[in-house]
Amino acid sequence: MGSWALLWPPLLFTGLLVRPPGTMAQAQYCSVNKDIFEVEENTNVTEPLVDIHVPEGQEVTLGALSTPFAFRIQGNQLFLNVTPDYEEKSLLEAQLLCQSGGTLVTQLRVFVSVLDVNDNAPEFPFKTKEIRVEEDTKVNSTVIPETQLQAEDRDKDDILFYTLQEMTAGASDYFSLVSVNRPALRLDRPLDFYERPNMTFWLLVRDTPGENVEPSHTATATLVLNVVPADLRPPWFLPCTFSDGYVCIQAQYHGAVPTGHILPSPLVLRPGPIYAEDGDRGINQPIIYSIFRGNVNGTFIIHPDSGNLTVARSVPSPMTFLLLVKGQQADLARYSVTQVTVEAVAAAGSPPRFPQRLYRGTVARGAGAGVVVKDAAAPSQPLRIQAQDPEFSDLNSAITYRITNHSHFRMEGEVVLTTTTLAQAGAFYAEVEAHNTVTSGTATTVIEIQVSEQEPPSTDVPPSPEAGGTTGPWTSTTSEVPRPPEPSQGPSTTSSGGGTGPHPPSGTTLRPPTSSTPGGPPGAENSTSHQPATPGGDTAQTPKPGTSQPMPPGVGTSTSHQPATPSGGTAQTPEPGTSQPMPPSMGTSTSHQPATPGGGTAQTPEAGTSQPMPPGMGTSTSHQPTTPGGGTAQTPEPGTSQPMPLSKSTPSSGGGPSEDKRFSVVDMAALGGVLGALLLLALLGLAVLVHKHYGPRLKCCCGKAPEPQPQGFDNQAFLPDHKANWAPVPSPTHDPKPAEAPMPAEPAPPGPASPGGAPEPPAAARAGGSPTAVRSILTKERRPEGGYKAVWFGEDIGTEADVVVLNAPTLDVDGASDSGSGDEGEGAGRGGGPYDAPGGDDSYI
């Protein structure tokens, strides 16, 4: 027993050593059956991850190394406390501490690996990116690097795919991406600022290769590319004779200057002033002008900014200047050169000329000083007086204007202004002098200014003349419908005018146009001119016979209505031969001349006198009322000439008949209906005449084709065969087309007659020789239509025998004609009469 006691401890120790390790752990340490787990992100795990074996007397807790708030221990089980997110934490760790009585016995670690899931969309670092691209950027160069266009995806394992979509049509031809996974922007073709100054793209990124893959996320951004123009083109002198936007064939300028004069203004060149602009309009650098060759003696100066070419010194003799003008950009990068040809021409020094001899203006009554006189033809526009140099248009700017004989008005440039308040209505005449400060030439013209009660109305109803006034308000009306029977070549203008109008104060010299007629000058269209009485015994002479009255050319007639002259006055009408030129007009001009009270004498121009009259555009009618008080009113005599003021508008009587208006639409429609009916009747009459004269021919053409006419030797001088009375053969001298053919030695058979040839008269055949010498010859020849022709010559036919040629076909003897042709030699020559075979195709002599 003692030996067993000695062996017991070693056996017990050996048994303890050979026991399984797990049995010892279960008895003394904490344990788990699995310490590594895999969980997809965004998965809510509610089941316990692992069960913890805790020995009796021990407790388990989470250590400090555990992922905060990720786990919890409930009982002896480990739970996942959060929804895992791969982008936030891809690996979760739980530290398990087993303690017994505050003493750490076992330490365990459990790991949770979070699996990545494609749950995030890619994002661009920008919404819109705007890039400036130089126009001269080389092709295949990278415009925007990859790093500036990459998108970011929180799913770190995702591969992004990029697509460039155009928003500007055709923009994809210029730019593209380097590859589908590399979003660098590359230039594919040269840029053109003028064709496409800017382009817009839509950049799209996707985190899957295809659109149908689930899940798939996309993102977009906008790219704006602004093309910056490059300095590629030099300045262009305009206008280009040819330009396609890239190349300009520059203009060359031409001008002329008078010798011995210095022009006060820049030269007027053709095709326009010197002007250049930057060929790169996007850059549009300012242009600096200079003359670097051809400026002999410094004759010309060019403005460096505007390019205006002026004369610095006069040219003594005619010559030609060839100036080379350079236009250079302000940044001195590029320049261009053109040629300016200036010819110095000897000037005759002609005075300036006015395009009109009479200008008409209007201004409201009561207008103060400094009011602009309006144009009577266009009341909304100021009246402009412009003279022109007949030789050099460059000298027009050197012309100054002034009013020489009136203190109520003044010139300011080309515009007429009032100098005082116009309190009285009427017509004023002022003379304007144009003075060329270079050539010292002068010219004058006349302005007729109507002072009316109010601004010229735009309606066509003229206001009634004011009571007691000598001149009613002047109005201008325009009608588009011509009023028959007065001829009109344009819109009819009616203006009311009156007498002489108010007189200027003392010291003012009025110089109206030379006219013995105080009434307003006729206008451009239908016009009426009232000539008031001449009180106080004054004498108004009208043209006498034989006088010549120069009047501007007009279209229409001149009618003069001259009432009786009471109080013993005489009224003389124009005598034959009187030439009374009227103002050029396209309508009718009527001149009313009131009576001449106070015993005055109103004489019409005598023969040979000249009375200028205002130009009209149509017919002029002059109404001359009675001249009371014993005055004498003489009408123009033949040959007189009455010059009157030139005008283009027609003053009409204010208070004329209201029926002198345009026709209404109903009137024109009625006139059109009448004209249409007349046209229809004319067409019907024409149809009847055509049917009467050409009806048989039309029936013949529409019916059976006519029988072919025989073509023989017809003598039109003889009567047809159906006539009973035979006429002798006419003499060759009476034949309209005599054809004398010499008689051959022996008669030859006649050839085929041409369709259009005229047969020889038989008289000419007899003149060739004696009929007794003629032998009988029978000839036949094939005609084109298949018939035969037979000719017989008689030997014993006397000279007194009549020769008759028959070739008059008839419709009822065709058979006889055929039989006559077949019976060729049986007495047809002498015994057969002309009636044997009428209408046959044979000629019997």
Curated annotation (Swiss-Prot):
It comes from the Eukaryota. Residues 539-549, 556-594, 602-611 have a biased composition (Polar residues). This is Cadherin-related family member 5. It is found in: Apical cell membrane; Cell projection, Microvillus membrane. Highest expression in kidney, liver, colon and small intestine. In kidney, expressed apically along brush border of proximal convoluted tubule but not in cortical collecting ducts. Isoform 1 is expressed primarily in adult small intestine and colon. Isoform 2 is highly expressed in fetal liver. Expressed in duodenum with higher expression in enterocytes along the villus axis and lower expression in crypts (at protein level). The modification Phosphoserine is found at residues 770, 817, 819, 821. N- and O-glycosylated. The gene is CDHR5. Residues 691-845 are cytoplasmic. It is a single-pass type I membrane protein.
